[in-house]
């Protein structure tokens, strides 16, 4: 009798285990996609791809590159597309990025959308003009204490067909980078020593993608140029250093960098309105692209001014280029303001934060600031202060154009 009970118990246990295995297999078949699916794009292009990944990465694998400044983290909301069919329900991570109307129209973040079944999607047509290059580092010097000017040489015969104010994405591989190995010119090492920046180490286990505005303008061909600020941890924090910027700061001439692009929406309006450019820090990049494009390529007669804020003269760069542009173009003026000029600067020019300088020295006496177009790129606090000042002056939001790299 005891032996029978033992066999019965073993049999029941085995049956339960087999039943659970069957349930798991059925659930897996329903929840985990496998095999190939078809993605129809804009009703014209068709891809046959393996199921199971996210839409953003699946498209990129097939050379269809949607913009993604956060590299697929679901925070930048640049990888938007319309999912006409397939893709399942919108995820909670997507909801804050869309209005109810957009949600009903099928807008999704491609980085959050699973590829589980046949799909129909719509993307901007310009996506099909996006290309991928393996570029070579031509130079990577400091132009300010915490900003590098990275210049990449494109492969022979290649060019980036971009508009001024556009950007590309850089791909950073897994790496271990030690700040003590950075090549920082002697004139910029003081603050690196002061804040003991050399102690940081960047460890990255997977590929990272980030977006950067180009500092060159369309006629500067064969290269792409960037102004990239190191994203070091705030003092006293346990946060890791910036993944992409740490890798960029360690790049040397001859190194290879993968680039995708071009992308963009921070473009100049085709009008005759006065243009006022406002920049700070690494926000110099799209300012340079726009201003050089207007004056060198388009030979614009529009009234143009550029207001740039820096801490001290050591943090100001491209000054000789802007001096030359001002000398060559009577319709262009530029103004540098220092918020913390050093004794060695012997500075007699404008001082203070750039939004106050712009208001006190120009806009408060301007007959019609609401008729100007304002283009800006800089640290988030600068952007917020400038936007408030312009709004208080009656400038409509449609005439305030922002390259919001600061989030």
From Swiss-Prot:
Residues involved in [2Fe-2S] cluster binding? 70, 76, 79, 111
Q: Give its E.C. classification number.
A: 7.2.1.1
Q: How is the cofactor bound?
A: Binds 1 [2Fe-2S] cluster.
Q: Which residues cross the membrane?
A: 6-26
Gene Ontology CC:
plasma membrane
At the top level of its lineage, which domain of life is listed? Bacteria
Share an example GO biological-process annotation for this protein. sodium ion transport
Look up the record and name the cofactor or cofactors this protein needs. [2Fe-2S] cluster; FAD
Domain FAD-binding FR-type: residue ranges? 130-269
Subunit structure, interactors included: Composed of six subunits; NqrA, NqrB, NqrC, NqrD, NqrE and NqrF.
Q: Which family does it belong to?
A: Belongs to the NqrF family.
The protein's name is Na(+)-translocating NADH-quinone reductase subunit F
**Which species?**
Pseudomonas aeruginosa (strain UCBPP-PA14)
Q: Point out the gene that encodes the protein.
A: nqrF
């Amino acid at each position: 009798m005891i032996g029978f009970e033992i066999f019965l118990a073993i049999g029941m246990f085995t049956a339960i285990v087999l039943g659970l295995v069957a349930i798991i297999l059925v659930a897996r078949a329903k929840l985990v996609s496998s095999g190939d699916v078809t993605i129809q794009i804009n009703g014209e292009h068709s891809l046959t791809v393996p199921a199971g990944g996210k839409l953003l990465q699946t498209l990129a694998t097939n050379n269809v590159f949607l913009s993604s400044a956060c590299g697929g983290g679901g925070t930048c909301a640049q990888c938007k597309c319309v999912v006409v069919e397939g893709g399942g329900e919108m995820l909670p991570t997507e909801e804050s990025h869309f209005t109810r109307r957009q949600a009903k129209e099928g807008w999704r973040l491609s980085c959050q959308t699973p590829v589980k079944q046949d799909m129909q999607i719509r993307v901007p047509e310009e996506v099909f003009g996006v290309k991928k290059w393996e570029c070579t580092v031509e130079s990577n010097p400091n132009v300010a204490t915490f900003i590098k000017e990275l210049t990449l040489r494109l492969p022979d015969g290649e060019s980036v067909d971009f508009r001024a104010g556009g950007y590309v994405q850089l791909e950073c591989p897994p790496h271990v980078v030690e700040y003590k190995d950075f090549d920082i010119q002697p004139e910029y090492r003081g603050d690196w020593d002061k804040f003991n920046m050399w102690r940081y180490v960047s460890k990255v286990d997977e590929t990272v993608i980030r977006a950067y505005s180009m500092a060159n303008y369309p006629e500067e061909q064969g290269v792409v140029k960037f102004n990239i600020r190191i994203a070091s941890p705030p003092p006293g924090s346990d946060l890791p250093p910036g993944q992409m910027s740490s890798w960029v700061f360690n790049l040397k001439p001859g190194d290879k960098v993968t680039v995708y692009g071009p992308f963009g929406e921070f473009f100049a309006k085709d009008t005759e309105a006065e243009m006022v450019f406002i920049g700070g820090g690494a926000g110099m990049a799209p300012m340079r692209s726009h201003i050089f494009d207007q004056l060198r390529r388009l030979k614009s007669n529009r009234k143009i001014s550029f207001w740039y804020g820096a801490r001290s003269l050591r943090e100001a760069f491209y000054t000789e280029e802007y001096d030359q542009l001002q000398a060559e173009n009577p319709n262009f003026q530029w103004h540098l303001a220092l918020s913390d000029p050093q004794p060695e600067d012997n500075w007699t020019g404008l001082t203070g934060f750039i939004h106050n300088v712009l208001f006190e020295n120009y806009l408060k006496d301007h007959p019609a600031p609401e008729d100007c177009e304002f283009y800006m790129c800089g640290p988030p606090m600068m952007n917020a202060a400038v936007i408030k000042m312009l709004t208080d002056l009656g400038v409509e939001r449609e005439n305030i154009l922002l390259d919001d790299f600061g989030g």
